[in-house]
Amino acid sequence: MQEKLKKLIGDNINFVFVGEAGSGKSEISINFAKWLVQLQDKPVHFFDMDMTKPLFRSRDVEVQMEETGIICHHEKQFMDAPTVVGGVNRLLKDEDCYVVMDVGGDHIGARAIGGYAPKLNKDNTIVYYVLNAYRPWSNDIDHIDGTLGQILGVSHIQLGKLHMVNNPNNGITTTAKEFIEGSRKMSEMVTPYIAVDFACVREDLYEEVKDSSDVPVFPVELYLTYPWLQNDLPNGQPVPGRG
């Protein structure tokens, strides 16, 4: 896993996750930060930039994240009042640490990083656009292009900075078959225009699907689960990942 990650990130130290709401950005960004911690070469700072929703926020599992060694940054949110997280500019310039930014969904969430564009467009940063073929605005290339264009417009991220992540899932009930079919569909849609860097799958499905994709597959541990999600599972099964 570590060698695969090192090859993926190269010399980059800042990693930003954007995409459609519900694409799985937060779960992936949390896991990505955890993988960086496991490299044991630099401290990892995690910024929760999401101001768009009250649930499925990385800040809600801050304790679990810090137990893995991640240094968390966020601001408390009241209703829909906008908040600005401190320390972003300083740490984006620090070459002795990694920075991971979890950005809110769609163009509404992406507005939060527009002011950091001059730093995010530098050579030491990767902006990951998370794609989920099972989301309504990612099921065809026209919808993907429309959502992507809106996000780039408000975030001021250069198109050339974008790297694609394939995250085909239907939540905690996702099957291996759904991952394989969603991964294939997304690859057929986007790879004629831009390469996909890697794919993510729920960790209990990893062994079953790891060789099914033409890009590296990374196993994702679920952090942002809630007890009521268990109602979606048959026969009272426990929620995969952290309950």
Indicate where each model-derived feature is located.
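Conserved catalytic-core segment of NTP-binding enzymes
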Residues: 108-213
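Hydrophobic positions on the alpha1 helix immediately C-terminal to the Walker A/P-loop
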Residues: 28, 32
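Long hydrophobic alpha-helical segments typical of transmembrane helices together
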Residues: 193-243
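Hydrophobic anchor at the beta1->P-loop junction of P-loop NTPases
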Residues: 17
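Switch II (G3) loop of P-loop NTPases
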Residues: 74-78, 96-112
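The conserved Walker
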Residues: 21
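N-terminal phosphate/diphosphate-binding loop that engages ATP/GTP or pyrophosphate donors
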Residues: 34-82
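Conserved lysine of the Walker
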Residues: 25
